[in-house]
Amino acid sequence: MNPDNYLHLSALLFTIGAAGVLLRRNVIVVFMCVELMLNAANLAFVAFSRMHGQLDGQVVAFFTMVVAACEVVIGLAIIMTIYRARRSASVDDANLLKH
C-alpha cells in the first residue's frame, strides 16, 4: 500500500477524533477520541518514516505510545474520581477538580 494512503487515513482518523472531542459530552467518549487522535498521529509518524526510509518516525511513535499508556492510567483515574463524586460521566462535571 502506498504511504500516501496511510497519511490520508491518518488525517481522516484525526478529524474523526477531533470532531468527537468537540461534539461529545461523555468523558469516556471524549477520552477515546483523544486516544484516536494520538493513534492517528502515530500512523502519520510511521508513514513518514517509511516514506523517507528512516526509523525516526517509528521511534517517535513508540515513545508516543508509552506516553499514551501513562495518559490512560491518569485519565481513567480522574474519570473514576469524577464519577464517584457526581455519579455522572459528563464533561460538564469536570469542574469538580476546581473545588
UniProtKB/Swiss-Prot annotation:
Q: Which organism is it from?
A: Mycobacterium sp. (strain KMS)
Please report the record's description of how this protein sits within the membrane: Multi-pass membrane protein
Q: Which reaction does it catalyse?
A: a quinone + NADH + 5 H(+)(in) = a quinol + NAD(+) + 4 H(+)(out)
Q: Which InterPro entries match?
A: NADH_UbQ_OxRdtase_chain4L/K (IPR001133), NUOK/Mnh_C1-like (IPR039428)
A GO BP entry = ATP synthesis coupled electron transport
Similarity-based family: Belongs to the complex I subunit 4L family.
Its job: NDH-1 shuttles electrons from NADH, via FMN and iron-sulfur (Fe-S) centers, to quinones in the respiratory chain. The immediate electron acceptor for the enzyme in this species is believed to be a menaquinone. Couples the redox reaction to proton translocation (for every two electrons transferred, four hydrogen ions are translocated across the cytoplasmic membrane), and thus conserves the redox energy in a proton gradient.
Write out the entry's keywords from A to Z: Cell membrane, Membrane, NAD, Quinone, Translocase, Transmembrane, Transmembrane helix, Transport
Which compartments does it reside in? Cell membrane
Q: How does it assemble?
A: NDH-1 is composed of 14 different subunits. Subunits NuoA, H, J, K, L, M, N constitute the membrane sector of the complex.
Q: Which residues cross the membrane?
A: 3-23, 28-48, 59-79
Give the enzyme class.
translocase
Among the entry's GO cellular component annotations, what is one?
Answer: plasma membrane
Q: Which Gene3D superfamilies match?
A: 1.10.287.3510
The GO terms describing molecular function are: NADH:ubiquinone reductase (non-electrogenic) activity; quinone binding
Q: What is its EC number?
A: 7.1.1.-
Q: What is the name listed in the Swiss-Prot or TrEMBL entry for this protein?
A: NADH-quinone oxidoreductase subunit K
Q: Record's NCBIfam families? A: PRK05715.1-2 (NF004320), PRK05715.1-3 (NF004321), PRK05715.1-5 (NF004323)
